[in-house]
C-alpha cells in the first residue's frame, strides 16, 4: 500500500489511479480518530454525480476498516483522484440511498458482493461530497 500511495502521489495519479483490468482508485487522506496521525488509504471508488462513493468492505472482515472510524470522527478531508486533490466531507450513505449506491459500487468492483456474503455486518458506504 505504501508503494502504491507513493507512486500515485509522485506521478500525480498517472501510476495508481487505473491499472489495466482493475477498478479506478483514489487516495483518501484521513486523520486517526485516537492517534491524530495523518494517514492515506488507496481505495476503489464509484461516482454518483459530483460525489464519490467508497465502500468500507475490508474484504468482508467482521469489523469496519480503521479509515471508516477515522472519517466518522473527522469527516472533513481530502482525496486525490488522478491528478486532482479535492476537499470533501464524508458521510455514511442513508438507508434510502444505500441500494442505489451499492449497485454503483458493485458495477465498479463486483467483488463487493462476495465480501458482503463473508460478513454478518452490513458493509457501510461512504459518500464523499466536494466541499465548497
Regions found by a protein language model. Give the residues of each.
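Short beta-strand element of the conserved SAM-dependent methyltransferase core
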Residues: 28, 126-131
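A generic local structural motif
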Residues: 12-14, 40-41, 113
